[in-house]
Amino acid sequence: TSRMEAATRATAQRKTQVATEANERHKATNAYQLDIPLAWYGKVATWQNGNTMGIYALSGSNQEICRLDALRNGETYQGDDTVLGTVSLGNGASVVVHGKVLPYQIAQTISGRTEKADDTYSMDEAVELVELATGNRYAYDQIKHDLVGKDGKSDKATKLEKDYLAQTLLPSIKAEN
C-alpha cells in the first residue's frame, strides 16, 4: 500500500509541477497571448509595455532574445531589428517578432569582426545566448565555425533562428479574448 500511495503522491506532484510550469510560461498582453518555449523555461524573463513584450535572458547579460509588437491592419514594422516572424491574429491585427540575430552577432563579436561597444559577451553568455536562440540545436562553436562563415553574411544564422521560433514560439501566439 505504501508503494501505491507514494506513486499516487508522485503523480500528483508531477501534475502540479507541469501545471505550474505551463502557467509560468503563459504570457499575455491586451492584444495577444503566448507560451514561452519549454527550452527557455527558467532561463528567460519578460517585460511588457502595452502590446509590446520583450523576452530576455536571465543570465548576467540580460540580452533581449526577441521582442513582440502587435500591429493593426495596414501597419508595418519600422524598427532596425531583423523580423524573425509574423503571426496573424485573425482579427485584422498581427504580431511581429523581431530582434538581433544573436547567433550571428555573437560569433561576429567574439571573432573580432564588430566594434560596437554594446556587443560584448563573456564566453559563458555567448554560449547561453546561442543555445537560447537556437533551442539548444546548435552549440556556439558550430555557429562560429559553420554558419557565420568568412563572407560575413548572416543568412544561415538568420534562417536557423527563424526556423526555431517558427516551430516553438510563433504557433503559440493567439489573439487575446
Give the location of each predicted region.
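Hydrophobic residues embedded in beta-strands of well-ordered beta-sheets
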Residues: 51-53, 93-95, 147
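Secretory pathway targeting signatures of secreted, lumenal, and periplasmic proteins
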Residues: 35-86
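Surface-exposed amphipathic alpha-helical segments
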Residues: 99-177
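Short aromatic-glycine motifs in intrinsically disordered, low-complexity regions
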Residues: 21-36
